[in-house]
UniProtKB/Swiss-Prot annotation:
Predominant subcellular localization, coarse grouping: membrane
Protein topology in the membrane: Multi-pass membrane protein
Name of the coding gene: ccsB
BP terms from Gene Ontology: cytochrome complex assembly
Protein name, as recorded: Cytochrome c biogenesis protein CcsB
Oligomer and partners: May interact with CcsA.
UniProt entry keywords in alphabetical sequence: Cytochrome c-type biogenesis, Membrane, Thylakoid, Transmembrane, Transmembrane helix
InterPro entries according to UniProt: Cyt_c_bgen_Ccs1/CcsB/ResB (IPR023494), ResB-like_domain (IPR007816)
Keyword Membrane annotated: yes
Organism listed in the record: Prochlorococcus marinus (strain SARG / CCMP1375 / SS120)
Membrane-traversing stretches: 14-34, 72-92, 162-182
Subcellular location: Cellular thylakoid membrane
């Protein structure tokens, strides 16, 4: 039992809580500095030569679960440990302190009052009414007053003692919500071309919400670099058969039916071309990482009734240019969407259009309401904690006509001392 008490005292100590907060902050910093949720091959490739912090290669990074910090075993362990520390501290310190503050303390001897931080004794006149005028004065100024014969106890700002337990409770809720969101939340990133839709299924396989991309635009600066991506969405709630139309862009997400939709990325979905007088043909585009980070393309097969041999088509923007390469890798021509036809051999190739696709990130986090509630409770508790709790005791000796006044305050003792003088003045008045 003795060792258990020591362990409990250690777990609920302020030093342990501070160390845990520092470790959690460092873990969060790692999660911010390192890309999260990517494929293992990406970490092995990117951190094999240029190591993270100069010592951590891709293999060690994966072993330490730094590719998913916030759902890693060690990060969740730190959050759980901090929660237990807060619970034990609340149960062992905050709750008894609150119960003690709620209970009235009855000082019966003048020497008990004289030992308080602020105290004073003075003689009153025989025709004075004793502590009754003081009781009325205190009640009129927002004090709670309790009188027993020639003794008076008063207190003000008791709600300030509720603040610390509320802060602890809010932090515990916040941690529970964050952990629940990590364990039960879902994340999905999809590329949608205009007029394409995505059905979001419930756990039992029923389609609850459908997301349709009605339009996608890329805002570019004069040099052609993308500045902003804008997706116009149609969201349909299948339960009530109702649709809403909203736009999302980078840093301007949308929350709908518990799902948050972010504008994440962009891509090129397809290209429509026409060879000579053939029908317009739409080809899907694939990303070609070997040629660069933002390069898409496709190998055009040999078309019937044409002397064209297979061509490699590449582009890096929906605006073009579109480059054609022969089987040998030699440049064969350059064109733009809705531009003049390109003559390759004896064939004319017209680029009708290039269809961009919007990268939409969907996040479902069931812990968000709990996190918001915990944050709100912590904020309210912090405001309450600012309020100082004042306590006052008065004992009147009938025979000697001596009145003893003493008080305590958990903060701003100098301010309470000034108020104390006003209370004494009220006794004379």
């Amino acid at each position: 039992m003795k060792y258990l008490r020591k362990i409990i005292n250690w777990l609920s100590s302020l030093k342990v809580a501070i160390v845990l907060l520092i470790l959690i902050a460092l873990g969060s910093a790692l999660g911010t500095a390192l890309p999260q949720g990517e494929k293992a091959e990406s970490y092995l490739k990117n951190y094999e030569v240029t190591r993270f912090l100069g010592v951590i290669n891709g293999d060690l990074l994966l072993q330490l679960q730094l590719d998913h910090v916030y759902s890693s075993f060690w990060f969740l362990f730190l959050l759980t440990w901090l929660s237990f520390s807060l619970i034990i501290c609340s149960w062992k310190r905050q709750w008894p302190s609150l119960k003690k503050a709620i209970d009235w303390i009855d000082y019966k001897e003048p020497k008990q009052i004289q030992k308080l931080a602020i105290s004073q004794s003075f003689r009153i006149q025989k025709n004075d009414n004793g502590i009754n005028p003081l009781a009325n004065y205190l009640e009129n100024n927002g004090w709670q007053v309790k009188i027993k014969s020639s003794r008076l106890a008063a207190r003000k700002g008791l709600i300030g003692r509720v603040g610390p337990p509320l802060v602890h409770f809010g932090l515990i809720l916040l941690i529970i919500g964050a952990t629940y969101g990590v364990l039960k939340g879902q994340r999905l990133e999809k590329f949608l071309a205009p007029e394409r839709s995505l059905n979001l299924l419930s756990p039992n396989g029923i389609s609850k919400v459908s997301v349709k991309l009605t339009d996608f635009k890329i805002d570019r600066d004069p040099t052609g670099k993308p500045e902003q991506f804008r997706s116009k969405l149609e969201l349909h709630n299948n339960n009530i058969n109702k649709s809403i139309y909203e736009e999302i862009s980078v840093n301007h997400p949308l929350r709908f039916q518990g799902i948050t939709l972010y504008q994440a990325d962009w891509s090129l979905a397809a290209i429509t071309i026409q060879i000579n007088n053939s029908p317009k043909i739409q080809f899907p585009l694939n990303k070609i990482d070997e040629l660069g980070d933002q390069v898409w393309g496709i190998v055009l097969p040999q078309m019937p009734d044409s002397d064209l041999k297979p061509l490699l088509l590449t582009l890096s923007s929906e605006q073009g240019p579109v480059r054609f390469f022969s089987e040998e890798g030699n440049p064969a021509g350059i064109g733009r969407p809705n531009g003049n036809p390109i003559l390759i051999g004896t064939s004319k190739i017209s680029i009708i259009d290039v269809i961009p696709s919007s990268g939409i990130l969907l996040k479902y986090d069931p812990g968000v309401p709990i996190v918001y509630l915990g944050f709100a409770i912590s904020l309210i508790g912090s405001v309450f904690s600012i309020i100082s709790t004042k306590q006052l005791w008065i004992i009147q000796e009938e025979e000697s006509r001596l009145m003893h006044i003493g008080g305590l305050s958990n903060r701003n003792l100098s301010g309470f001392a000034n108020q104390f003088n006003s209370i004494i003045k009220a006794a004379y008045d």
